[in-house]
Every structure is written in structure tokens, then in C-alpha cells.
Amino acid sequence: MSGTALVVRGLSKSFAGVLAVKDAAFSLERGRITAFLGENGAGKTTTIKMVLGFLRRDSGEVMFRARMVGYVPEQPAFFSWIKGGELLDCTLRLHGVPLERRKERIVTWCERLSLDPGLLDRRVSTYSQGNRKKFSYLQSLLVSPDLFIVDEPFTALDPTSIMDARRLFHGLAEGGAAVFLSTHLISEVEKVYDDVVIIRRGEVILRRRREDPGPPVDLETLFLSSVRSPSRRA
């Protein structure tokens, strides 16, 4: 499946008169993995929250062309009293999935994410940070999103889980989903990205496809040359 899943134009946000994001613009294509890179405080999470409607934007527009959106925050938060299985079952019930298909889908995704199904009988608040992150992946993927947004996708994951996550992103893209990864771990996203969007001090300064003409440049070099350049914007 090809085509555009999301278009962002002129997105801006200020806090107490301080500009956090200025005229951000980019698009996400189905079947491709986009890396969203920026230094701490560059505006990555603020941009994501505006795109998803968690934060009111001052100006700009966000156009969704995706049927279903999945989102994994950097630090997932859950009600302290709820068990994992109860939350997943509730998620699927809200989307009208029949009981027999709910159980099947949950088991399938537990296997794909290497998450012990036994954890689902425990409260999510008792999970380790790594399992809580994987559980957040599981909950978001149950609804079969064709736009999947992840803030710091590798945080709290061990090396094996990071490799599982990379395979997951490839599989989603091959299935036609647009995958958007906001991260600091350039070395990990280097192995999976198709497109890159770089933001510096609230401004998107570079949009590039891996296959764009020109000599091959590793992602770390591209990122450093972009954020250190005084006026680069492309």
C-alpha cells in the first residue's frame, strides 16, 4: 500500500511567549519508516502531542489520511489497579472485536513482542520498565494501525527487545503502515529508517529520503551537520 498517511503544515506552538515549535511541516508515507531526530528540547515531543491532539496548536494544520493511529509514548502511564489482560480486552471491546478474536489477537501479539502472556494476569503497575514499554506497544498494535507513532522507541528495552522492535517496524512498513520514530538513539534508527526529519530549536531544518541523490551519508553525520549548521533548512 502506498500514499500519504499524514500531512503536517505550518505547525507552531508557544509557551509563555517562548516559541517551542515554529512552522513545522512534513508528511509521512505509507510503507516507510520515518526517523524524527532532534536534540533534547528541540520540540519533538511537543510536535507529536500537537499532531495527536493532546496539545492545542497555535497555528497550522494536521491532515490524517490513515484509518487507525497507534501511539506509544516515551513513558507509558497506566491505572495502577488494572491488570494487563483486562486493559487489552477493554481496548479490543471498544473497537468492536468479538471475544474469540480478542483472545487470539492478544496471544499473537504477545508472541511477536516476546511478552510473557502470564504478565497479563498481573497489574500493569507491577511490570518492569521494559515490559511496560512492550505492553504499550502491544496495546497500540492490537487495533492494527496504519499510522504508528513512537516516542523514544528503544527506551527501557534490552538488546534483544531492540532487535525485536526493529523487526516489528520493518514488518509494519512492509504491511503498508507509516511508521514514525522520534528518538535520540541514532545508531538504532539508522538500521531501519527510510526517511528522516530533523528538528532544531523548534524548526524542521531537514527532510530527506534515504535514496535521495548524492553520496551516501550515515545518519549521525547527517544529523550533526544539520544541527550545527547556522542556517540550513531543506
Predicted segment positions?
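Catalytic Walker B motif of ABC-type/P-loop ATPase nucleotide-binding domains
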Residues: 148-152
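Conserved ABC transporter NBD signature motif
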Residues: 28, 53-56, 60-68, 206-208
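Conserved signature/switch motifs of ABC ATPase nucleotide-binding domains
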Residues: 139, 143
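Conserved ABC ATPase "signature" region
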Residues: 89, 101-119
